[in-house]
Amino acid sequence: MVGAITPFNDPLAMAAHKVGPALAGGNAVVLKPASATPLSALHLARELMESGLPPGRLNVITGRGEELGEALVSDPRVRLVTFTGGVETGEWITRRAGIKKLCMELGSNSPVIVLPDADLERAVPAIAAGAFAQAGQNCLGVQRVLVHDRIYASFSKRFVDHVARLRAGSSLDENTDVCAMISAREADRVESWIAEAVEKGARVLIGYRREGTLIWPTVLENVPEGVKLDCQEVYGPVVSLYRVASLEEAVARANRVPYGLHAAVFTESLRDAFYAVRHLDVGAVIVNDSTDYRLDVMPFGGTKLSGIGREGIRFALQEMTETRVVCFNL
């Protein structure tokens, strides 16, 4: 049996990424969706049952994680726990699960490196989309942009001008570029992180405006090392720009956070691209696109605090099955 715990963002896709391979591997599944967005999982279960899935194969439980998590994770019938969410919860699951297989994606602080030969016409909109779609509530969202000194002024002006044209509003409006945060509590947290960075010397280039749970896309520079925006996962519509003098410095700064999910580099040089591929300590390096580039056929996961194991159709199926050796002596 597989225990699957999913986050509030992309609730249908996240459930499908876990339920599909688990069922394909012959497992029963107990799915615990985020309490803020449970309806997608319930609709998925209904559609599968109406399509002929045998009773008991997919079981959806809803409620607060604090109340349901202990029972799900510690139950001896659950042989694998697959979880997408925060590091604290992931560490808690690791302690409670005992000797079980675990597959966990625990977040990121995704860096993008922009080198002097980068095509800024391509880089600027791609980075902005990767940073501010879903109000940054995406584990692959861009959080840090490491820009070479030689093009920093040009890039920052273009980037801020592009962000100024983004439309903030309701996610039900198809013209909206940046939607609201999932809750007032999360908006409070993101606002406090921006305030901390500003108090310690960061400069706001655009944004730092709030209306209810809507935080306008915010871009900062001179963010000091060690503040939360610099080294933790913001999970909000905030990007920090950094000057770097070389590719080597950019890679070193990209690697100094405790996460390693996705990173990206914009360059026309294959030599520089492969240097980044070899030296960035992450699960995926995206060349000339945003960190949020992903296809379901790709192995998805990271290094360090970004988690354990890999998702993606074939790779998740491998995680959710056991290898058995059978020998016949005839």
Whereabouts are the PLM-identified features?
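Short helix-capping segments at alpha-helix termini
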Residues: 50-54, 166, 170, 227
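Hydrophobic packing residues within well-ordered alpha-helices of enzyme cores
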Residues: 41-44, 72, 93, 155, ...
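Short hydrophobic/charged patches on amphipathic alpha-helices used for structural packing
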Residues: 69-70, 124, 251, 274
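ALDH superfamily catalytic-core signature
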Residues: 80, 88-224, 287
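A short hydrophobic/small-residue beta-strand
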Residues: 28-30, 204, 284
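Rossmann-like NAD(P) dinucleotide-binding subdomain of oxidoreductase/dehydrogenase enzymes
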Residues: 1-122, 244
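Conserved C-terminal structural/oligomerization subdomain of aldehyde/semialdehyde dehydrogenase
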Residues: 78, 113, 167, 194, ...
